[in-house]
Amino acid sequence: MIVKTRAIVLREIRYRDQSKICSLFTREFGLLSVIIKGGRNPKSKLAGRFIAGTVLDIVLYKKTTREIQLVSEGNLLFSPMVPQPDIERYAIMYRIIDLVSQSIDGQEKNIPLFSLIASVLEELYSTSDRFRLLYSWFLLKLVSLLGFEPSIHRCVLSHEEISPATLAENKGELCFLFNPGGVALPASKSVIENENRPLSMATYALLSAISSTPLNLLKNIEAIPPQTDLLCNLLEEYCTLHLVHHPHKKNIAIVSQILSE
């Protein structure tokens, strides 16, 4: 059966002399393994298109009895091979697709997750800076989509609204709890008993801002790098904690090291 779908390349490996096998996250079929015949031949029409992080519209011959599907066409939409390469952009891109690989459950399709990944990658490849702010936004949306949305505007323990008056009463001191997930006022003893991280007012303000800002308006958020880094590290720790599968911990450590340099 010949089918069309949009796909994100998660991984590629060499196969024989000139071909490659890729792991794709597709809009209609979820996770697929495909073969790109001649994909490493410079003369092939598919050469250079199926690399990690690219988003394409593809045509493939799909058989339910076959584990690896055959791709016949690939129209490139977004690619990390932008005119001005940046090592931090690549590090963020690899971290995103690594988290996606952990989040996908078999071949089950997940259109909301696919749409999130595709839109974030498109934005990542079109911007020239503030990659960590975009990554923080992605982490928050991803963990929320997976069913672990943290409570941000109400205390996760008391359910009290976190208002300016409440913050003043608590001298601006907040905590972020991993379980249950969300922001907490420090008045409760439970905060001490649960795993938590201190949350400054500046970091909380940034968290609150990105939680209510659509992707196309993210550029309007004012954030200094130190606060973005703190929030990014916090959300990555929270997100990783709640992912069920952890097959690529070595990759996570490598990318985290790149981002910290």
UniProtKB/Swiss-Prot annotation:
Protein name, entry field: DNA repair protein RecO
GO biological process, one term: DNA recombination
Keywords assigned by UniProt, alphabetized: DNA damage, DNA recombination, DNA repair
GO cellular component entries: bacterial nucleoid
Species for this entry: Chlorobium phaeobacteroides (strain DSM 266 / SMG 266 / 2430)
InterPro entries noted in UniProt: ARFGAP/RecO, DNA_rep/recomb_RecO_N, NA-bd_OB-fold, RecO, RecO_C
Family to which the UniProt record says this protein belongs: Belongs to the RecO family.
Gene: recO
Domain of life: Bacteria
Gene3D superfamilies tied to this protein: Nucleic acid-binding proteins (2.40.50.140), Recombination protein O, C-terminal domain (1.20.1440.120)
Any single Pfam family the record assigns to this protein: RecO_N
Biological role stated in the UniProt entry: Involved in DNA repair and RecF pathway recombination.
PANTHER family: DNA REPAIR PROTEIN RECO (PTHR33991:SF1)
